[in-house]
């Protein structure tokens, strides 16, 4: 066993630590606050996408393919989720200019491992531990299972439709 000293800059350069965490929420009274936050998240994700594309090209590195992670609401009644996933896909495509394709959007909803149809797009279930290795994945919808014990260095932007007050839960979610 050898002791290794690794600086924060080296870890950050590897992509395991993010340069910054930005927490944003619109002012009260803003129409559809959640979709405004999703718009901002999609804009941020696109900027990171462009940055990584340029950086990997310049450094002759394998392409990173950053992921947008979206925490959705639990469902009520028979609904799988109370978040309108169709609207989410539409908003992401509008803001980024990307036309998402089958295999690029996945879900980790433990209640169903079925493939969902969202805005005409097949959204398959993906085991959380497999997400980091699948370079085709761009967007992940989740409920709770990614909030603890999951790590994906490609996860560049996260947005949550859930309202949380518990400091421990918030810290765990941000730690992902």
Language-model regions: role of each:
Residues 1-61, 65-67:
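Conserved P-loop NTPase catalytic core
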Residues 7, 11, 36-44, 84-91, ...:
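Alpha-helical scaffold elements adjacent to nucleotide-binding pockets in ATP/GTP-utilizing enzyme cores
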Residues 9-13, 97, 150-151, 162:
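Short, surface-exposed basic-aromatic patches at helix termini and helix-loop junctions that form
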Residues 14, 18, 75, 174:
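Single, functionally critical "micro-switch" positions that shape active/binding sites
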Residues 17, 134, 151:
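A short catalytic or substrate-binding loop motif that flags glycine-/basic-rich loops and adjacent residues
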Residues 29-32, 78-81, 150, 169:
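Extracytoplasmic/secreted cell-surface and envelope-processing proteins
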Residues 49-148, 164:
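Conserved C-terminal RecA-like helicase domain
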Residues 139-142, 146-164, 168-174:
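A short beta-strand element within the Helicase C-terminal
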């Amino acid at each position: 066993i050898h002791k290794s000293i690794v600086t924060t800059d080296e870890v950050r350069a590897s992509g395991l630590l993010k340069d910054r965490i930005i927490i944003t929420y619109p002012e009260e009274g803003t129409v559809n606050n959640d979709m405004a936050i999703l718009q901002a998240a999609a804009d941020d994700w696109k900027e990171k996408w462009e940055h990584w594309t340029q950086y990997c090209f310049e450094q002759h590195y394998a392409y990173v393919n950053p992921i947008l992670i979206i925490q959705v609401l639990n469902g009520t009644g028979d609904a799988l989720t109370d978040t309108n996933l169709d609207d989410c896909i539409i908003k992401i495509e509008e803001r980024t200019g990307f036309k998402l394709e089958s295999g690029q959007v996945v879900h980790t909803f433990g209640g169903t491992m079925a493939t969902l149809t969202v805005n005409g797009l097949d959204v398959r279930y993906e085991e959380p531990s497999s997400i980091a290795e699948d370079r085709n994945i761009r967007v992940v919808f989740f409920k709770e299972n990614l909030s603890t014990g999951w790590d994906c260095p490609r996860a560049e932007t996260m947005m949550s439709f859930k309202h949380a007050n518990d400091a421990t839960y918030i810290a765990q979610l941000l730690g992902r």
